[in-house]
Amino acid sequence: MARVERSLLLLVPASAAYRVVADVQAYGEFLPGCDSVEVLQERTLEDGVSEVTARVTASARGLRQEFVTVNRCQPFERIQVQLQEGPFDRLDGCWTFKPVGDEGCRVELELEFIAKGLLMKTLSGALGSVSDRMVDAFAERIQSAS
């Protein structure tokens, strides 16, 4: 199993950072390689957590992949991501949003995955650089939205 961890320190409130990451529908506007997002289901659970199931179509290194994730969003604190179907045997992730001082926040991303198939296993070595570009794109979007 491979693991990716990234952390950002931003001069925006945690709630602003959370809103950008939770807005799955907008990913195609700013994430590199994200061709489209289709929200399949949205619901609010009894504990105040919202759950969004979405199909993402992404391209990288000439390979186009489609995957479905379920995102469980604890408002302004955490977003847990779990693969429902796609090119991985397993993909779990978690975004956390922690206030720092009066107007800043720390945003952390942890991903764990097991690639499926020989081609995906070969390409999985590039996931670190893909994650860096993705986190950078989120940081730019968060800062421009605030």
Summary of predicted features, one role per range:
Residues 4, 91, 109:
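Exposed loop/turn and edge beta-strand positions of beta-sandwich/beta-sheet ligand-binding modules
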Residues 1-46:
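Hydrophobic ligand-binding cavity/cleft-lining segments
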Residues 22, 92, 121-122:
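Generic recognition of short, well-ordered alpha-helical segments
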Residues 28-29, 36, 41-43, 57-104, ...:
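Hydrophobic-ligand binding "helix-grip"
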Residues 17-18, 27, 54, 109, ...:
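Hydrophobic pocket/interface hotspot
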Residues 46-52:
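A short, glycine/Asx- and small/polar-enriched loop/turn
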Residues 112-146:
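A conserved amphipathic terminal alpha-helix motif
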